[in-house]
Each structure stands twice: as structure tokens, then as C-alpha cells.
């Protein structure tokens, strides 16, 4: 028996075509591995059957929803991770987990080759292959979409010629990637930057005007940075994301229309829906404003950005990311409390904060009766703080 190919299978166009193509061109058997990351949509058994219909000798489903929420979404919250200050890494954080399970499947099913359906223009090829190199450098990597320069038109034509069941047409050629953390849509008419997204682009979120008269107020509770309750009810990490996806999505929260800088050097337009992710990151960042000392908070903003860049760039297993996470774990020791937010009209508004770990001192902050701030100390502080500027200005005026 020839060496098996272990394919990361999504059920979409590129990986469905890849199963048939690998079998025809290489003669190798394909084991399709589909990872359930809470993406919803089609039943995973239907996805498995499609893989078999396309020619896979085996189709495996891995339920990784809780693992994804706790091991990948949670660090994204702890690092307030928004690439280019906007994108909550919807696809980027899923790739290292998919890599992990593909490597495990390769060991279990006797595969010496792993395959993905990424193009040569995207970031995912890097995320997959750097991940494989980090976890299993002995495995060979096959990337038919990239290495044979498939276009979407060619892939659609191949699928039609070989009766491969897909949910894509030349009239509506969206590329969609989704999981419980969010949804990413690209290609088609969206590649023209002036074209506004149409209603059919969105799935996780309602039009922001639909529930205009019924705003939703929600209280998110945290312990050491981790979401643990919603409106006082205990939740798991996965439950927190799912509930906020539903509630924030109903208010049109989490719609992002982004032109981002890809790792490969080009700019790309992406439409993202991440209602739960944006609420949780917003709430967590707000709680840090209340509980972190100023210099620590300032420095963490730099590490948050760097962590997001590392993950976006496919360096999930890098020593720097590991070191940053050790630092961030220390910062979360006092990040416990509750944040109250109003979800309305596509926006998130924080309107309440409370924490037993708060560094906010009412008696120092108030301008009313009860003020304990010693204002007589301010004059000397201002003088010393501005002394270097004063000396520099005096020199420049000479």
C-alpha cells in the first residue's frame, strides 16, 4: 500500500477538489480529517460523507470545540489580540490546532504526508507548514492548490467535471472560513474595495438596525482574566463565546470590513463576523484598565500587539510567543471582576465596572466632599516632572 496522505478537510471547494486530485495524480490514498471548531453550518457527518464521495478512503471528525475555546480563544482574550487593531485572529488561531490534530492523525493512520488546501497568496500556507515543521519535521507537506496554481475557476471546473459536491458557483465565489470564534469571507466581488458587502455576505450577525429598539445589556464576569460568568450565571469558555455570539450577533455587533496586510506582502480585503470575540476582548481590556497598574498596562499593550502579530504570522509555537504568555499569565493575577456592556446597533458600550481587585480609589478620584488627595503635593510633582523639558527649552532659546 502506498503511503497515505492526511488532508486537512474543511468540506469546501479547495479541499474537496484536493481529495480527488491527489488520488488521480499521485495514486495515494487520502485520509480526510475534519476538525469541529464550532463552525456550525453543515452537520459534520455530512462533511465526512462528502469526503468519502470525493474519494477519501477514510474520513475522521475530531470534536475540538472545548479545546479550541480554552486553549486558543482564551489566550486571544488574555492578550486583547486584534491584528492591526481590528482583526481578532478568527482563522489564525484555528490553524495550529488543526495542525496538532493532523499530526496526531498522521501517526495514527500511518501517513507520512500531510496536505492542506491553501493558496500561495494567503497566510494559511505559512501557518500550516511552520506548524508542521515545529511539531513533526519528519512529515512531508503537500499543497496542491498552491504548487499547481489552481484558480477558483479551475477548481470549480474540476469539481463540475468530476461531480464533486460543493456549495460554490462562479456567480457567488465566496471563500468562507468559520469557527465558534468568528467567520471570515473573502474573494468574489469583495475584492473590489469600493463594493459594499451585500446581505448574503453575513451569517453570524443581524443587520444592526433590526433590533434597534431593544438593546441588550450583558454583564461578563472574569477570574484571573478568564470569562467565567454571564449575567451572574457560570459558563465554560465555549458557552461564553456561544452565548455572546448569539446575543451580540442579534445586535449586529462584530461586523468588520478590513483591508489587512498579509504576511506574504500583499493587502487583502476581508469581511469578518466575530460578535462574541469582540465583546469578550472589549470586556477583558476594560477590566484591565481597572485592575492593572499604569506602567504594567502600558507595557502590556505592546506585548498584546506583538502576540497578535506572531499568531497572525504563523508563529504559534515560537519561543517569543511562549515567553510572552508567561508574562501575560503574571499580569492576569488581579484581573477579576465584572464588566457591564450594552450591545446595540452594531456597537459595544461599556457602562459599568466592578472588581475587588480594582486600583480605582473613589476617595482619591472624587472632586466632591470626601476627597483625600493631597493637592499640595501636586506643585512639586509638576515641577520635577517638567524639569527636563524646561532645561531643554532653555538651551534651545539661548
Curated annotation (Swiss-Prot):
Top EC class, one word: ligase
Name of the protein in question: Argininosuccinate synthase
Residues the entry annotates as binding L-citrulline: 87, 123, 127, 175, 260, 272
UniProt record, GO biological process: argininosuccinate metabolic process; L-arginine biosynthetic process; urea cycle
GO molecular function: argininosuccinate synthase activity; ATP binding
SUPFAM superfamilies according to UniProt: Adenine nucleotide alpha hydrolases-like, Argininosuccinate synthetase, C-terminal domain
PROSITE patterns named among the record's database cross-references: ARGININOSUCCIN_SYN_1 (PS00564), ARGININOSUCCIN_SYN_2 (PS00565)
Positions annotated to bind ATP: 8-16, 117
